[in-house]
Amino acid sequence: MTLRLSRRAYAEMYGPTTGDRIRLADTELLIEVERDHTLYGEEVKFGGGKVIRDGMGQSQLPAADVADTVITNAVILDHWGIVKADIAIKHGRIAAIGKAGNPDIQPGVTIAIGAATEIIAGEGLIVTAGGIDTHIHFISPQQIDEALASGVTTMIGGGTGPATGTNATTCTPGPWHMERMLQAADGWPINLGFLGKGNASRPQPLVEQIEAGAIGLKLHEDWGTTPAAIDNCLTVADDTDTQVAIHTDTLNEAGFVEATVAAFKGRTIHTYHTEGAGGGHAPDILKVCGEANVLPSSTNPTRPYTINTLDEHLDMLMVCHHLDPSIAEDLAFAESRIRRETIAAEDILHDLGALSMLSSDSQAMGRVGEVIIRTWQTAHKMKVQRGALAGDGARNDNFRAKRYVAKYTINPALTHGIAHEVGSIEPGKWADLVLWEPAFFGVKPAMIVKGGMIAVAQMGDPNASIPTPQPVHYREMFATRGGALARTSLTFVSQLALDAGIGARYGLAKRLVPVRGCRTVTKRDMIHNAWQPAIRVDPETYDVVADGALLTCEPAAVLPMAQRYFLF
C-alpha cells in the first residue's frame, strides 16, 4: 500500500527533498535540494513510534559494522553540492553520505544502524562543514569560545596573547613561544595551527620556527616586509612545504606592489585582506588578485560594504597598529588604507570569484565570531544589487551559495595544506560539522560537532525537566571535557616538526597532523573562486577596473542577519 504525502507534509516530517527550496536566514538567498540520497518510504527517523527501532530501522550488526553516529535526513550545503542525505560518523570521521537503515530488511542501505549507533535528528536542518578562519591574532583565548559558537572549528594564525606585537601581527615568534602555544592548544576544543614570524633575510631564524611546529610563516609590514624578507621567507616555505601569508607594505617604502609581486617569483602565497583596508600596498594591492600564484582573502570588517564601514575603520586601525592620532604621519598612514572605492569593488570581486577566501583578523581589525555571518551578508547584498550569477537561474542561488561557502571552508583548507582532514563534508574527513535551523542559518548554529562528538549546542536550563526551557544559550558539551577534548580536535604542525617528535618532547595530548601540499596549490585550485582578472586601480580616484569593467556598488543601509537576531 502506497501513502502519498504532499510536499509540505513530507518536509514537515522528513525535511526538504529534491526540488524543495530553502531560504537562508532572512536573506534573499534561496538554495534548492539537487538530489535526495534517502528512499521515499524507507526514510529513517528516531522517536516514539518511529523507524529506528530494533528489528525495524535498527539492525543486529555489531559495532564494527555500523555507524557510531548518524545524522538523519539532513540537507548538506557544501562546495560540491546541495543534497539531502543521512550522514554517518565513525571513529571521529565522516564515514559515508547516503541512506541509513537496516540492510537486513530495507533496500538501498549504505549506512547500517545498530545498537552501537547514536542518532542526531537532521530533519529540517542544514549541515555545513566547520568553518576555517585563517587570519587569527591569538590575543585572547576567549576568542575560541566565540569562534566555535559561530560555527568555526579551525583557527589558523599567530600570537602569544595581548602582547603589542600580537595585537598588530599574526605571528608566534620563535621556538619558545611556538612550544608554549602548542601546549596551550591542548586546552581548547578546536583545531589550531600557528604561523611563525616570517620577517627575516636569512633562513635559519625561519627554519627553526618550522621545526618547532609552525605550519607556515607570516610576513607583516610592521616587522618589515621587504623584497629580501619576502624572497627568503618563500624559499624556506618551498623547502619545508609550508604556507606563507603576507600583509604587504602599505607605505610602499621598500617598493610598490609590482616589487612585491616580483619578489614572489611565481611562488604560492596567501595575501591577507587583499583589498587593503586591513593593510597592504596603497592603493592598489587588489592587483594581486590576477596573479596565478596568489591566493587572496578578505578580512571581515569591510564585508560587506555598508554606510558605516568607513567611519569605524579609522579608530580601529589606530588602536590595532599602535598609532597616535596626534601624529600627522600616523594619521596619514591610517587614512591611506581606507578607500570607499576599493572596498566597494571588494564586494564584487568576491561575487565573481576573484577573492577566494574570507577570514576575521580577530581583535586586530576583525570580529572572530562574524566570519560566517559576513560571508552570507555579502552574498545577499550582491544578489540584491547584481542579480543572479551566471550559474544560477530564477529558482535558486545554488551556485552563489557554493561559491560563498567555499570561501570559509574548502579554500582555506586547500591554501594551508589541511584539506586532507577538514574543509568539506566528504567521507574520510574529520567530522567537524555545523547544524543550522534555516531561519538561523549563518547566524546561530543549533549544534557544533567536533571530531564526531557534540562540542557546543544551544541548551536550556540544566535544572529543567527537559532540555528546552529558558534560558537557552550556547553551552559546552562533553567533547570539551577531559580526555575527549584531545581526541576530538586536531593540532596542525609542519612535517619537519612531526618528524622531530615535538609531540613527545612538548608533552602534547592532541593528535598532531602535518600540513601538506602548501607549495603546489594555485589560484586555479580555489574552488568556485579562481577568477584571475587584470585589475587596475586609479591612483587618483581609486576606481577599480577588472578586465576592462568598472567595479562599483552602493553601500548597504540595511542588512539581513543583523538586529533581527541580536538584542545587543
Curated annotation (Swiss-Prot):
> Where, in this chain's numbering, is Ni(2+) 1 bound?
H135, H137, K218, D361
Reactions it catalyzes: urea + 2 H2O + H(+) = hydrogencarbonate + 2 NH4(+)
**Localization in the cell:** Cytoplasm
Q: Which domain of life does the UniProt lineage start with?
A: Bacteria
* Catalytic residues, chain numbering: H321 (proton donor)
Q: How is the cofactor bound?
A: Binds 2 nickel ions per subunit.
Q: Where, in this chain's numbering, is substrate bound?
A: H220
Q: What class of enzyme is it?
A: hydrolase
Cofactor(s) needed for function: Ni cation
What GO molecular function terms would the record report?
Answer: nickel cation binding; urease activity
What Gene3D superfamilies does the entry give?
Metal-dependent hydrolases, Urease, subunit C, domain 1
N6-carboxylysine carried by residues: K218
Question: Which BP terms in the Gene Ontology apply to this protein?
Answer: urea catabolic process
- Mention any one GO cellular component term assigned to this protein in its UniProt record: cytoplasm
Q: How is it modified after translation?
A: Carboxylation allows a single lysine to coordinate two nickel ions.
Q: Detail the disulphide connectivity of this chain as listed in its UniProt entry.
A: none
> Cross-referenced Pfam families, in alphabetical order?
Amidohydro_1, Urease_alpha
PANTHER family per the UniProt record, alphabetical: UREASE
Among HAMAP family, the record links this protein to: Urease_alpha (MF_01953)
Recorded family membership: Belongs to the metallo-dependent hydrolases superfamily. Urease alpha subunit family.
The protein here is known as Urease subunit alpha
**Which gene underlies this protein?**
ureC
